[in-house]
Amino acid sequence: MEQRTTLDWLMNWYLSQCDGDWEHGDGPEIRTIDNPGWRLKLPLRGTERDGHEFTRFSHNYEHETNWFTCWTENNEFHGAGGPLQLAEMIEVFRSWVTDVR
């Protein structure tokens, strides 16, 4: 199946992790923050990136709305960003996950 959007990719990634156990742990979270903006948390336990570190990446961090930052902590991928940056954060995660070496 062609993955047309970033959200399509994330939904398919989530489904590919579901093994009868993984999905019963702490699942992916997408929330709003009061800046305004988005917060993304994706668990890595049991995935191809389990135990891997992602060096913090920030884009336009001082901008009021057009900013985001992504990092790993406690075996989770995190992103936080402005109100129009959710897809960008998911794309950073997608690039990192699909670049497994």
Model regions and ranges:
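Amphipathic, interaction-prone secondary-structure segments
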Residues: 18-58
